[in-house]
Amino acid sequence: MPAPDDCREILERTWGALLPPGSRCGLALYPDHWNVGDAAIWWATRRLLTDLDVTVAYACDPWSYDPRALGASLPDGPILLLGGGNCGDVYPREHACRLRILADFPERRIIQLPQSIWFRTPAAIATMAEVTGRHRDFVLLVRDHASLDVARAQLPGVTAILCPDSMLALGPLARLAPATVPVLALWRQDSESRGPLPALPAGWVARDWTLAGGPLPATEAAQLSLASRRFLERVGAPPAWPPRPPAADEAARLSRRRIAWRHLPWLWDQLAEDRARRGLRILSQGRVVITDRLHAHLLCLLAGIPHVVCDTANGKVFAHRDAWLGRHGIRSASSAEEAVEQAASLLAALDAAGEAAVAR
């Protein structure tokens, strides 16, 4: 099994074969929400594209996608769809935009960056199969063997390639703050969770890193998020879904949007990096971390934070582990209760042997 550093080399090699140096591309599905994992994927994607000497000529999120603006900014060249875990019917907004881009550009090469595929209903995968079957050049990078099997068996016309998660392109990281609690349990509160945590020992902290349902914090990241929306509105790209009908002054609106796409990637890069670093700061609070989030696990791995990882309801965490990382010192638990037991043992080992020796 490759180590994390080897995974970065695989990403460079796989993406480099699809995107020659000096090429221009579009990059769709910017994640303008508070899931740290998706922000880290965008951050890693932009860094890797820069390293490969690939220029992003157009960027959009699901609200601001406009085929006319994309065509004007990028008359030819591939369109990239951000990687992650939203290829399926669990996250309809992102997936609907993915299908629309495939339908709008049936002759253009479209590259779906590394994804896990998860459909809950046969009708939903049949809809995607209908769209991919009409497309001439759709390259689908998948993060695990189960997704590869689905792509090859049920999505006609797709070139499916196994590839690690994009976030591993970040390479080695460091803790952003000293640990302040013995164990931090960063646990999902959504449909991908396999269940709640049990009662934790005194002093341990449980939380998630999304802000769904809560107010935005008064931070630079929140200000940037609001600024990005206001910027879209000023250039005639209001964040509406489904997209609004074309304006009467179509030529002027497209001109404003072409200017916008030259600046939006920079703005979104700052926001994505800030959100990803926020997640790493949260994880840095624990001497030991328990998590069922794939990207919390990967951030801990890259930053050398001792942790115990559990799987999600759709199996994507362990599927990625088994495809790319094997064991490599990864402590895995089959249940939240087992994760708590392992974390307690790991904490005792840190106390007995010293953190540096155990982390090695």
Give the ranges of each region predicted by the language model:
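Active-site anion-handling motifs in enzyme catalytic cores
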Residues: 1-360
